[in-house]
């Protein structure tokens, strides 16, 4: 765990929680090297939450319930335990293919919101769900299907108390030849516990 903490500035990916970029090397996950594209994101136990030791299991369980019980497409994920038994959550990046990185745009970007024009809490901007639907109508190659998937995801977030369902936790993902679809769900967890 010290290796991760000592390298957090070099390999951390965006977001509030500390995250690390990993790659599979002969079947073993390791930190990415400078300039190397990571295949996985690892999220260790956060420092700033109530019941923080349960956060990795909470996210993994919530993602599994979404996928296995409700049929919501989710990013492949799992739990990883350090040698001292400390858990971490990891997720396979879904914006990579054999041909390289796929374009992924979160809803904050698609709505034109940034820290500069929306302030420090821009991703929590109170856009109505109707505005999310307009974004899907404008950019999705199959808007009716994606709006239904989005509605199901909103209901899931409500039922499972995911209070972190902000603009940057919904994305459209490039498929083929510039066609975009609602991405698999990610960052699903019961925030009421934390």
Where are these regions (language model features)?
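Conserved ATP-binding subdomain of kinase catalytic cores across diverse folds
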Residues: 2-120
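Conserved kinase catalytic-core segment
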Residues: 54-70, 125-193
